[in-house]
């Protein structure tokens, strides 16, 4: 089984989520029991909603648990260098438009593009891995191929924990 990189903070966030989800289980089971006692299950919206919630809850618990043993937990504070690797914050410039973007490369289970972090397994992440300042990459995007130049590579240590 292939390991999955994740920051210490990302791992802790998933541990907290798993703990919270497991604490929700009894309440969902109780909601199902109470809805079942209301009678006819074919037209019982409360029962259907509780069963749906249980399904989503169990699916997320199973997903997280299946990933936990495969994680390669990496302390971002120990990273550095001149090459793009997991944990690097990379500034890239669109060669054609001059638009500049900044991304931190993280694992697929903690990447949040809206907050500036992308998965190292995303098309941009894969194109950046192993590159240096001044290198150019080409990314296939819906609007066509985009050429970027790597402007800077930095390592900032632990990322700020997102509010849970």
UniProtKB/Swiss-Prot annotation:
Q: Which UniProt keywords apply?
A: Coiled coil, DNA-binding, Transcription, Transcription regulation
GO terms, biological process: DNA-templated transcription elongation; regulation of DNA-templated transcription elongation
User: Organism's domain of life?
Assistant: Bacteria
Query: Which InterPro entries does the record associate with it?
Result: GreA/GreB_C_sf, TF_GreA/GreB_CS, Tscrpt_elong_fac_GreA, Tscrpt_elong_fac_GreA/B, Tscrpt_elong_fac_GreA/B_C, Tscrpt_elong_fac_GreA/B_fam, Tscrpt_elong_fac_GreA/B_N, Tscrpt_elong_fac_GreA/B_N_sf
Coiled-coil region(s): 12-38
What molecular function does GO assign, one term?
A: DNA binding
Q: Name one Pfam family in it.
A: GreA_GreB_N
Q: Which family does it belong to?
A: Belongs to the GreA/GreB family.
Q: What does this protein do?
A: Necessary for efficient RNA polymerase transcription elongation past template-encoded arresting sites. The arresting sites in DNA have the property of trapping a certain fraction of elongating RNA polymerases that pass through, resulting in locked ternary complexes. Cleavage of the nascent transcript by cleavage factors such as GreA or GreB allows the resumption of elongation from the new 3'terminus. GreA releases sequences of 2 to 3 nucleotides.
Q: What's the name of the protein? A: Transcription elongation factor GreA
Q: Which organism is it from?
A: Solidesulfovibrio magneticus (strain ATCC 700980 / DSM 13731 / RS-1) (Desulfovibrio magneticus)
